[in-house]
Amino acid sequence: PLETIIPVTSINMVRQLCCLLESMLPGEGEEEIRDAEVLESLFIFCVIWSFGGALVDDSMLKFDQFVKRLANWVVIDAPGRYAKAGQLPGTSPTLYEFEFNVKEGQWIPWSQKIQGYEIPMNTPFNQIIVPTIDTARNQFILDHVVLKCKQPIMFVGRSGTAKTATINNFLSSFDQDRFMTRTFNFSNCTTSMDVQLSLDDNFDYPTKDTATPQGGKEMVVFIDDVNMPTVDTYGTQQPIALLKLLIDRGGMYDRGGDLIWKSVQKVFYITAMAPPGGARAVLDPRFTSLFNIFHVVSPSDESLHHIFNTILGTHVKNFSDEIQHIFKTVTDATITFYNDVVAKLPPTPSKFHYLFNLRDLSRVFEGLCKST
């Protein structure tokens, strides 16, 4: 059986499929798609990111093979040649590496969206986002689910997979005249009252029982580490119960003595979290079922080399030729060392602190970027 990063119901996958199809099919007043093969290719692309969007790495490979076998289309694996509608691309291992472009009627590698990027000089290290295949497709998913469908979305992935950075980059691109954003960083001390009071600060009340974002704008709420709040005596995470009420019922009760119901309008939700374990609780399935859920995979070695070669290469641009000739070797050696540490030093009961992730690797390169 296929394994998902967190439990996902069948009906949730179908709802996610409908959301993606709705966001990619022509809207009212736009030209209809009349080519059956274009529609079928679009459907396959949406199936990959709905039924297969929350799968773990190994299951993604199995699901990809199943979809290809089920479609039984010609596979195009010639370098430099794109597969068209009615064909499947084979130049990369899986369909997860491709976007089906409806206008052009062909499968385009995500890698085509990340070429020619240069880091602006003097950018703080923690604000550098080097585009990769992963960030390109996550940005695409955010655009379609949040902006076009206006549905809640949840990114789940290990620490250091750039979930927060990708979402913050997405939020920073918004039209400030149309949208306002609010970010919550949940912890084990977060309470439902904290969340409600913070939201209240950003609302106008055109009537006593209706809340809308200030200035007539739409509001996108980003909740990071959503599974961190403490589970109470009754097995409930109170901030999660409040969010479930907001998303499912579209409102919340006033905390005053009258307990007036307030309808909350024009608010959309993005959440991110690492898989449950340690201080991270298992979320209520009734809460997660409200979201479009996507697994943010760990970057491949190829992506890691691209990221850190770009960062280090920018830093040593004005260094001597000797340094510029060896910086790629330094990147290769550091990534190899990191992979060896992860493989050979797993956490054990006596060494439970042996938890290494990509943030540790980033700290090494942050130190290298302080060299003069």
Predicted regions: what they are:
Residues 147, 196-207, 222-264, 268-270, ...:
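Conserved catalytic/switch belt of AAA+ P-loop NTPases
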Residues 41, 142, 332, 336, ...:
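The conserved phosphate-sensing helix
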